[in-house]
């Protein structure tokens, strides 16, 4: 699935739509350059899950846990991870194989420990189409999501 957005609000809204469709136990990987809108998208996912607290990138903490929504939301940013042992120290498997949903930024750095069934989300800019243009590509096991028309 490919979604084009033309403003941060549209990127947020698409994230919210994903969050509304998310099911317990799903693991999403989120790929995109710095400043592409990963945090805005993630904030939308959180709102779609009914999370009421502020959502920010966990760059320095590796994981932020949110429990105020309809299911737990675990937001990982593994950009600064030194090695897989750091993931083991935080008990990643409890999150990846639990009843909440995980969204993992920079997941390519920990590919060897990702579950087999993931949903990959890539956000790309194209300045020729406008400063706020984003191409959001969702691939993987889309049948996990109850996709509906907007």
What are these regions (language model features)?
Residues 1, 85-87, 93-150:
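Short phosphate-coordinating micro-motif centered on Lys-Gly-acidic
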Residues 18-25:
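Phosphate-binding P-loop
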Residues 28-30:
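Hydrophobic anchor at the beta1->P-loop junction of P-loop NTPases
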Residues 38:
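Conserved lysine of the Walker
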Residues 51-66:
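Short beta-strand-centered segment that lines the nucleotide-binding/catalytic pocket of NTP-utilizing
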């Amino acid at each position: 699935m490919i979604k084009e957005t033309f403003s941060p609000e549209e990127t947020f809204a698409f994230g919210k739509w994903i969050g509304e469709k998310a099911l317990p136990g799903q693991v999403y990987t989120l790929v995109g350059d710095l400043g592409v809108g990963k945090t805005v998208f993630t904030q939308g996912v959180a709102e779609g899950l009914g999370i009421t607290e502020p959502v920010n990138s966990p760059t320095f903490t590796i994981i932020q846990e949110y429990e105020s929504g309809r299911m737990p939301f675990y937001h990982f940013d593994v950009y600064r991870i030194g090695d897989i042992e750091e993931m083991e120290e935080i008990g990643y498997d409890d999150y990846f194989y639990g009843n909440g949903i995980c969204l993992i930024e920079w997941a390519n750095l920990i590919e060897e420990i990702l579950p087999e069934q993931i949903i990959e989300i890539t956000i790309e800019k194209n300045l020729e189409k406008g400063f706020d243009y984003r191409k959001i590509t969702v691939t993987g096991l889309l049948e996990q999501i109850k996709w509906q028309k907007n």
